Amino acid sequence: MKALSELRILTRDQAAALSGFHSTTRVNVRLSKLRRARLIQRYFVAGATGSRCSVYALTRKGAQTAQLPFQPLKWSADSVIIGNAFAAHQLALNDVRIAMSEPGPTLALWKTLDEPISPTAKLVPDVLIERKIDDEWRSMFLEVDLGTETLPTWTKKTQYYLRIATSGEYKTIIRADRFGVLVATDSEARLRLLRTHIARLTPKLFWFTTLNNIKQQGFWSPIWLRPEGDQQTLPGA
């Protein structure tokens, strides 16, 4: 229930991973009970093979029962939301969040951002991630890219990130003394395109990988590339 409040929608497999269930039967029974009690409701999105895949969201009753924040969705229960950009993006973010739960550095903060992080920059990263390693805070903004944003949009984003980095304005936003920008793309081709484009603006600040790499090898693995060079590093290292 807490994960649904934080992440808005979850597939069955995502719900199982976040709750620690290892049995499909067990998670199906749990979801069915919650639906019958009207604590959650179901929608349908396109699965990996093109078939329909069920996703679940918290209802107002569920949020009130669990005393959790409620963010209403505009869809009717059991409706088909195939092709919805918000759903696709949120489910991709969920996969990243799950990959961060694998063995590795303790995640101190995962904060979804809905408003600009600065009054001087129209910049809304997907998530602020902060973790503590050897008594030192590391702060990273996460951008999940499914290929829907234009290169001019990425130019503006990069310029905004550079502005808050050079001005020192980030010190009012994060706990660390510096930050990085992590970009997770939906394909190797998109990764190459964004790296090449952003490298024209800066060789610093950014790290890139694919969503597939994150799912297969883990978020905290050395799977990240800088705008220039071929050496893979840890995120934000």
Q: What is the meaning of each model-derived region?
A:
Residues 8, 38, 104, 168-169:
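Structural motif
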Residues 94-100, 164-167:
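Metal-dependent nuclease catalytic cores in nucleic-acid-processing enzymes
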Residues 1-80:
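Nuclease-adjacent, charged terminal/linker segments that flank catalytic cores
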Residues 1-3, 12, 148-156, 166-237:
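Non-catalytic C-terminal interaction segments of nucleic acid-processing enzymes
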Residues 3, 7, 19-22, 84, ...:
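Conserved aromatic-histidine-acidic binding/catalytic patches
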Residues 77-93:
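A short, highly charged nucleic-acid-interacting micro-segment common to nuclease
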Residues 43-45, 84-88, 97-140, 146-160:
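Active-site metal-binding core of divalent-cation-utilizing nuclease and nuclease-like domains
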Residues 7-11, 63, 115, 147, ...:
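Short, solvent-exposed loop/turn segments at secondary-structure junctions
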